[in-house]
């Protein structure tokens, strides 16, 4: 009895002994509780649902980066065009807000911001012509090209829609009425050539400017050349676009990017601008701001890889082999 009394007294003095009497003797199963009931059946479903959402996010993350990159490009570029042109109407603003150079800076800032947003995620193509050129010369997977281009075009649609919504009252005043929509304001979003330009001249202007753009993109991303660090690449593209706008931008409004023209043009069609968007100059929308930039980007990439690229990241391998033989000859 005295031994039993000592055990009872020690148990009463040790608080852990009381806690231990509350714990179950056997380990709990993952779906059981202390009361022996099941967990809420929705818990596994919620976990599975979150995993599915994460998988979807991972699958669309790169195309979404392209989407937001192009949307930003249009917001800055078309937004600057709207501000400069619409402000020339005295009923919209007391004085003009900018010049053609302001529009050049707007598009240049747009390309820089778009690449900063998307560059570390998707590569920052934000241009179907560049995406196709990267697939041709830099091993970008062709299976990803359709999703990138779709995202880029949709980004152009949404970006144009946001700018249009922001300036809709100024557009109404500029056009002279809510239901009046003409090329005068359509040209703030989509590209149109100057009246004296021939079809061949329009094509050549877009081809040339995009070839320069593509060659510079390949140079700026060539680690064997004096390429900037990844964080400074958008700034280099900013300088490039200011130069392109200042030198080759007047005649066709320098699309250089199928998504930059076709996306906003699709939005304008939905906004009531009519068939003239696509009938202009015998389907100008197709051969000038789409086909010419795609071919120009191919030409720029071909020229860079043929004459300047010395690496093994191009399908044009003979330049690399020739350079290695030359270096070996110098050593010997």
From Swiss-Prot:
Per the Swiss-Prot or TrEMBL record, what residue ranges does the short sequence motif NPA 1 cover? Answer: 127-129
Q: How does it sit in the membrane?
A: Multi-pass membrane protein
Transmembrane residues, as ranges? Answer: 67-87, 101-121, 145-165, 200-220, 231-251, 284-304
What Pfam family is a match for this entry?
Answer: MIP
Q: Which residues lie on this side of the membrane: Cytoplasmic?
A: 1-66, 122-144, 221-230, 305-332
Which ranges are annotated Polar residues under compositional bias? 1-20
Q: Which domain of life is it from?
A: Eukaryota
CDD domains noted in UniProt: MIP
> Cross-referenced Gene3D superfamilies, in alphabetical order?
Glycerol uptake facilitator protein
- Where is this protein localized, as stated in its record? Membrane
Q: Which UniProt keywords apply?
A: Membrane, Repeat, Transmembrane, Transmembrane helix, Transport
Q: Could you name the Gene Ontology cellular component terms for this entry?
A: plasma membrane
Segments of this protein annotated with the region Disordered: 1-45
Reactions catalysed, as given in the entry = H2O(in) = H2O(out); NH4(+)(in) = NH4(+)(out)
Q: Which GO terms describe its molecular function?
A: glycerol channel activity; water channel activity
Motif NPA 2, residue numbers: 257-259
**What's this protein's family per the entry?**
Belongs to the MIP/aquaporin (TC 1.A.8) family.
Q: What is known of its domains?
A: Aquaporins contain two tandem repeats each containing three membrane-spanning domains and a pore-forming loop with the signature motif Asn-Pro-Ala (NPA).
- Record function comment: Water channel required to facilitate the transport of water across membranes. Acts as the most efficient Laccaria water channel. In addition to water, also shows strong ammonium transport activity. May be involved in fungal nitrogen (ammonium) support of the plant host in symbiosis.
Put simply, this protein is called: Aquaporin Lacbi1:317173
Q: Which organism is it from?
A: Laccaria bicolor (strain S238N-H82 / ATCC MYA-4686) (Bicoloured deceiver)
Taxonomic lineage per UniProt? Eukaryota, Fungi, Dikarya, Basidiomycota, Agaricomycotina
């Amino acid at each position: 009895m005295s031994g039993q009394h000592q055990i009872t007294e020690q148990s009463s003095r040790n608080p852990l002994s009381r806690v231990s009497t509350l714990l179950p003797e056997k380990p709990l199963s993952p779906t059981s509780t202390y009361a022996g009931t099941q967990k809420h059946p929705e818990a596994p479903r919620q976990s599975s649902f979150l995993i599915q959402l994460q998988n979807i996010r991972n699958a669309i993350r790169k195309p979404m980066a392209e989407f937001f990159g192009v949307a930003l490009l249009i917001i800055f570029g078309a937004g600057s065009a709207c501000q400069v042109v619409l402000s020339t109407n005295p009923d919209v603003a007391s004085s003009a807000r900018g010049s053609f150079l302001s529009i050049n800076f707007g598009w240049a800032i747009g390309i820089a911001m778009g690449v900063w947003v998307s560059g570390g995620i998707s590569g920052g193509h934000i241009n179907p012509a560049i995406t196709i050129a990267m697939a041709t010369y830099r091993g970008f997977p062709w299976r990803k090209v359709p999703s990138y281009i779709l995202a880029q075009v949709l980004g152009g649609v949404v970006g144009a829609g946001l700018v249009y919504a922001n300036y809709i009252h100024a557009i109404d005043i500029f056009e002279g009425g809510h239901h009046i929509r003409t090329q005068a304001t359509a040209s703030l979003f989509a590209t149109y050539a100057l009246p004296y330009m021939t079809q061949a001249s329009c094509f050549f202007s877009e081809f040339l400017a995009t070839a320069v753009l593509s060659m510079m993109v390949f140079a700026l991303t060539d680690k064997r050349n004096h390429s900037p660090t990844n964080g400074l690449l958008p700034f280099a593209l900013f300088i490039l676009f200011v130069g392109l706008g200042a030198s080759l931008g007047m005649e066709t409004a320098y699309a250089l990017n199928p998504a930059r023209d076709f996306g906003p043009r699709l939005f304008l069609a939905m906004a009531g601008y009519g068939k003239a968007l696509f009938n202009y100059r015998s389907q100008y929308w197709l051969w000038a701001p789409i086909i010419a930039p795609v071919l120009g980007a191919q030409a720029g990439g071909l020229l860079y890889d043929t004459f300047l690229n010395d690496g093994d990241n191009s399908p044009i391998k003979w330049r690399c082999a020739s350079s290695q033989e030359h270096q070996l000859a110098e050593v010997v």
